[in-house]
């Protein structure tokens, strides 16, 4: 019986070993980037080949031919809400990201996601969602590994940067945040807003220069003057009152906030409120 059990175990080990696969590094490793831009969640999935002393644009990546914008499977990008890329509207969804290089430009093609692998021989025009272009910028250094990144991120958008070898292409993403935020704020303000709602609305109107009077109204509803205000509440009020031109009141808030930050031993609060206080003291 023991001999039989041993033979069964040995057989299982041999069978398992026969299906084992040797793992090795991928020449073009996959990269996945998740980025919040404004109110939009963006996910980018692509492979990253390296230069390895090869000529890239006009060589490995031929001019005027469809490129998968990376290696292996086509690059994919998804948006949780509609955006604009170089002023072309893109609906929420998941897309393939192809490109077509020339000597001086890189056209980016947002394409309906399909089961295609690798590059396409031609585009099906009915599947082209948008085609946008960027002039190549010559870089002073060589980028060894193909890189796509989101840069210059703000409340309202970012850039999509594509770099490889000594070339950079930049595309503007507009997250259309302002219209969405104003609509959201109006809806919230009509439905029993909380302290946090008033504070966020006030700071958004302040940061985006929409309506500083309304920002003051909301920040005062969020944080009524009292001895219980925290240093960051006073920082918000100082900034908003400063922009509104009410400098004496802004200075008062900055000074009080600075003292409370010291009491709380909050280094970041101390540093930021000291800067605001000194700036206001010099006006």
Regions found by a protein language model. Give the residues of each.
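A short tyrosine-centered beta-strand micro-motif
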Residues: 90-99
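Bacterial Sec-dependent N-terminal signal peptides
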Residues: 1-25
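Structural recognition of beta-strand segments within beta-rich domains
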Residues: 76-78, 84, 90
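Alpha-helical adaptor scaffolds
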Residues: 185-249, 260
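TPR/TPR-like alpha-solenoid helical repeat scaffolds
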Residues: 233-243, 266-283
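Primarily secretory-pathway and cell-envelope proteins
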Residues: 21-62, 114-195, 267
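Conserved positions within tetratricopeptide repeat
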Residues: 213-216, 248-251, 270-274, 278
């Amino acid at each position: 019986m023991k001999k039989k059990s041993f033979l069964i175990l040995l057989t299982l080990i041999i069978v398992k070993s026969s299906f084992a696969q040797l793992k090795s590094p991928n020449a073009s490793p996959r990269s996945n980037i998740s980025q919040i831009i404004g109110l939009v969640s963006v996910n980018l999935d692509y492979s990253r080949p390296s230069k390895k002393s090869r000529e890239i644009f006009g060589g490995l990546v031929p001019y005027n031919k469809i490129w998968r914008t990376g290696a292996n499977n086509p690059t994919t990008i998804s948006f949780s809400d509609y955006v604009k890329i170089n002023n072309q509207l893109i609906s929420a969804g998941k897309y393939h990201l192809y490109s077509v290089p020339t000597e001086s430009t890189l056209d980016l093609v947002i394409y309906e996601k399909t089961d295609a692998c690798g590059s396409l021989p031609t585009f099906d025009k009915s599947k082209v969602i948008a085609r946008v272009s960027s002039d190549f910028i010559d870089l002073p250094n060589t980028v060894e590994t193909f890189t796509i990144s989101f840069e210059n991120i703000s409340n309202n958008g970012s850039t999509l940067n594509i770099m490889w070898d000594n070339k950079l292409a930049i595309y503007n993403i507009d997250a259309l945040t302002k219209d969405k935020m104003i609509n959201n704020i109006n809806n919230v303000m009509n439905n029993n807003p909380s302290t946090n709602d008033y504070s966020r609305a006030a700071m958004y109107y302040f940061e985006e220069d929409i309506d500083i009077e309304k920002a003051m109204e909301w920040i005062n509803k969020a944080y009524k003057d009292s001895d219980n205000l925290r240093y960051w509440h006073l920082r918000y009020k100082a900034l908003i009152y400063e922009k509104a031109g009410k400098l004496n009141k802004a200075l008062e808030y900055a000074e009080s906030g600075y003292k409370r930050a010291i009491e709380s031993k909050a280094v970041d609060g101390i540093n930021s409120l000291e800067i605001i206080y000194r700036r206001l003291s010099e006006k």
